[in-house]
Amino acid sequence: MKILKFYPLFLMLFILIQFFNLCHANESDVSKKNKFLNQSKINSQQTSYLIDINRLKIPLRNDGVMFDISGYGTTPQYDESQVLFSGGFYLVGKNNEQYWANGVATASRVLDYLPGKVGSNPDDSLNIIYVVKSTDTPFGTSWQEYRNAVLLGAEFYDGDGDGIYNPIDKNNNGQWDANEDKPFILGDVTTYCVYNDSQVDTLRRYQGVPPFGIEIHQTAFAVGNPDSPLYNTVFFKYKLINRGLVNNLLDSVYFLFWSDPDLGDYTDDLIGSDSALNSVYCYNNGADAQYGQNPPAISQTMLQGPVVYIPGETFIDNNSNGIYDAGIDIPLDTAIVNLGGLLGVKKYPGAKNQSVKSLFYYLKSTPPILFDPITISDVWNYARGLDRSGNLIDPCTWAFGNVVNYPCNLVNPVYIYNGDPVTQVGWLNTIPADVRMFVSTGPFQLKLNEPVEMWFAIVAGRGQNHLNSISVLKENIFAAMNYYKSNFGSLPTKVEDEEIVLNDFRLYQNYPNPFNPETEIKFTIPDKQFVTLKVYDLLGREIRTLVNETLTEGEYSIKFNAENLTSGVYIYELRSGKNAQAKKMIYLK
C-alpha cells in the first residue's frame, strides 16, 4: 500500500482547502491499494467526470487533475486494476530572465490551478466539465448545455457560418445537417473544461511564483470501438493562453505532460522511452501481484508540439525584425494543428511544430539528484532532460540502469532508458521503483492572448507477458499517432491493416533500432508516384534496394533483414521526384 504523508502544517492547509472547496485533491493518506469503488461518471456539481468509453478509464477534474480525485479511489482503470495514480502537467519558463514553474501534479504536491477562466470565481456554475457524446440526441440537452462551454472558449462547428453557436434543427428532420451548428465532438465522448493558475501563494508548490494569468483549455476524448487499437487510448488537447496578469510575454516555456504510473503494485515499475514514437512509458519487471503474469504497459505520448516561429529555420526574416511577416518573409516550413474532419486543420506558414525536448522520469525519494522537483530549478532541469544539478545523466555509470549490447557513450540521455527491453539492446532501466514520468516539449513563448495548442495521449497495451505488453503498447501508440495525422479521420481496426492516408511525404525511424537481424521501416507518400527505398553503408555504397516501383498514396511498411551484413551504422533513404529523406539505423549482432 502506498501512502502519501504530510506534515501537520500542510495537513491544516489541506483541511482549509477542503472547507473552502478551492480544490478537491485526495492527497492525504491516499492508499494505492486496489479497492474498487462504484462511482457515477459525473459528480453532482459536474466538477469531475470518468471517461470510461473504452478499456482505459480516466477520471478528470475541472482543475486539470487526472486520476487522483476524491471519490474515485482506485477504481479499475485498465482491466482489473489501476495503471496511474495521478496525472497532469508542469509548466516552466522565464519571466524577464527570472525562472518560474507551476503545474498540476498532485503526487508531487503540486496544485497551482483552479477551475475557470482568469478572473473568474472557481465555484462559478459555469466552471464544470462539459461532456458531449457521439450518441447524444442531436440538438438535445448536451448540445444546449454546450452553449456555456462556448462562452468559455470551446470550439464548435459553425454550420451556418454566422460565428454564433446556435444548435437548432432548422428543417425539423430530427437529424443534424451540415448547415447546422454542433459541438466539437471527437471520438465517442469528448470533455472540455477551463482552469487557470490562480491558486493562492500559500498553497502553491513554488512559493513566490505569482499567478501569471495562464489559462488552459483542456479537451479530452476517447474512442469506444473495441475492434480498434484506439480502444486503449485517451487523447488530450491543451490550449494555453497568457492573459497577461504579470507580463505580455513569457519566454523559454516548456510543457511537461506528466503522470505517476502505478501498474497494479506500485513497487515493481520500470521506465523506458521511444523517441521515434515521442513516448515515455512504464512497464513491470515481471509478473505483478495485481495483474498476474501479463501486466500492461502505459505511455505518455506527444502527438503534436506547440507552434513556434524560428528565424533562419522556419522562415527567412527579410526585414530582420525576428517576427514572421506574411508577404514579406519567406516561409521554410509550415506548422499544423489538427482539429478533426469538421473543423479541419489550422496551418501556420513560416512555423514548425516544436519537437519533444526530453522523455524523462524521476523517483519519489531516491536518488537525490533525481527525485521530486522541490525547486523551480529542478523543474527547469528536468524539462530539458537533466538531473537536479543541471547535468546530463551518464548512461555508462548510472546506477539505476545498464546499457546492453550497445556503446554506452552513444546513448542520448535526454531520452531516458531508450533501449529496447524486448530485445535487451540499449539503455535499460534495471531497478524497479515508485516513479513519475513525463514527455516535455519546448521552448516556446506565451504571448498575450495568443493560444498555444498541443496534442498528447495516454496509451495502454497488454500482451502475453510484461515484455510483450511493450510491443502491444507501441502498436497502439503507432495507431494513435496515425489517427492524429489523419486529422482524426480514418479509424484503424488493426494496426497491421491500417490504410491511413497522410498529407505528407515522410520516412519514419526504423523499429526496433538497434536491431538484430530484422527491422521495420515505415513511410508515407501523399499521392501516386515512383518511389525508391535504398540502404547504404557509411561510405555511401548501395547495400540493398527495398522499394523501386510506382506506389499509390498511403502508408507502407517494409521489412529489412541484415543477417548477411556486418554490424554497424547504415543509412536508409526514401526518394520520390524532388522529395528525399534519410535516416540512420544500427545493426548489432
Identify the residue ranges that each predicted region occupies.
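Solvent-exposed serine/threonine-rich low-complexity stretches and specific carbohydrate-binding patches
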Residues: I543-L551
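Bacterial Sec-dependent N-terminal signal peptides
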Residues: M1-D29, T493-V495, F523-T524, F560, ...
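Extracellular Ig-like/FN3 beta-sandwich strand-entry sites
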Residues: P451, K528, E553-E555, L565-V569
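A long-range scaffold signal marking pre-active-site subdomains of enzyme folds
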Residues: A25-L491
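Short, acidic/polar linear motifs in exposed loop/turn regions
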Residues: R243-V246, R462, Y511, F515, ...
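C-terminal tail/sorting-segment detector
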Residues: K559, E563, S567-K589
